[in-house]
């Protein structure tokens, strides 16, 4: 459930009542701030959670405000994925004879945990709090996004030396005319050279040059383009239903086939069926509808 702390209890649907009926139940609770703490009952959204947790301050370019990474880090990454992981772990425990338990999945906790490697790198002296000056935050010239002559963009991720050498070759640079890859004192200079060179050709031209190489160069595609890329079509990564293009379920399993639902149910379509499945009589269900308890 995703209410603020205490709401489910007021409805008589809190974990205490539910676990009393079924001690093996796994009760998942996902909130922004968690079930406890001074902010637990406060309103908030993804941007608030990742702001307090730490990641937001490190996303963006040097000398500019932090960039908002959609709602992927807090809502989906820090919230949903950790809730799912917690529920699955608790279900494994139940299958091994343990009792069910309550999962407190706070987006602020999950967002911080996603950034665990960065916290470690910072405390070890390998990561600066100055945004846009580090390896993975657009500080490095070989891990950034560059504009091409046509106005489209390329994503570059040539971290390892062998990949970096392929990048230099594709750009037409002799290794001797470019400063050492990992010398941060020259990163800005190198980035300017890369940016100027990428602007000399269209993205399609660069993709032909880097095709088949290990330069770690890929196009930056929008949601109207990504599903049309050959890699996506060959893997069948998207599907269409009711005229809407959507990603297929991930991950993929070797034995269990996962298929997307082709049609969405209308609101209330399965209400009676669900109530019957949990033991409610037809008279009770009719009463619920009449009183507006369900729809």
Regions from the PLM with identified roles:
Residues 212-261:
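A glycine-rich dinucleotide-binding beta-alpha-beta segment and adjacent secondary-structure elements
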Residues 100-108, 180, 286-290:
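Beta-strand segments within the central parallel beta-sheet cores of soluble alpha/beta enzyme folds
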Residues 141-213, 217:
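Aromatic-enriched alpha-helical interface/lid elements that frame and gate functional surfaces
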Residues 111, 186, 225-229:
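Beta-rich nucleic-acid/ligand-interaction surfaces
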């Amino acid at each position: 459930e995703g209410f603020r702390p205490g709401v489910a209890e007021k409805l008589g649907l809190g974990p205490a009542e539910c676990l009393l009926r079924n001690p093996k139940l796994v009760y998942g609770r996902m909130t922004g701030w968690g079930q406890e703490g001074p902010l637990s009952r406060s309103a908030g959204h993804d941007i608030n959670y990742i702001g307090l947790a730490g990641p937001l301050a490190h996303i963006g370019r040097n000398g500019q405000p932090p960039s908002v990474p959609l709602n992927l880090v807090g809502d989906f990454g820090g919230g949903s994925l950790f809730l799912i992981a917690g529920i699955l772990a608790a279900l494994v425990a139940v299958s091994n004879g343990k009792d069910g338990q309550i999962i407190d999945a706070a987006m602020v906790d999950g967002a911080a945990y996603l950034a665990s490697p960065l916290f470690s790198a910072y405390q070890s002296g390998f990561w600066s709090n100055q945004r846009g000056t580090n390896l993975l935050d657009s500080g490095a010239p070989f891990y950034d996004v560059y504009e091409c002559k046509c106005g489209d963009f390329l994503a570059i991720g040539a971290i390892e030396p062998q990949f970096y050498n392929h990048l230099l070759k594709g750009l037409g640079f002799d290794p001797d005319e470019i400063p050492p890859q990992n010398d941060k004192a020259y990163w800005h200079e190198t980035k300017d050279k890369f940016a100027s060179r990428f602007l000399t050709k269209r993205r399609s031209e660069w993709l032909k040059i880097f095709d088949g190489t290990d330069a770690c160069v890929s196009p930056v595609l929008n949601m109207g383009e990504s599903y049309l890329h050959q890699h996506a079509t060959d893997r069948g990564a998207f599907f269409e239903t009711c005229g809407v293009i959507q990603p297929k379920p991930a991950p993929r399993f070797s034995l269990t086939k996962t298929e997307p639902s082709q049609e969405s149910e209308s609101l209330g379509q399965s209400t009676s069926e669900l109530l019957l499945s949990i033991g409610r009589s037809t008279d009770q269900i009719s009463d619920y509808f009449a009183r507006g308890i369900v729809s």
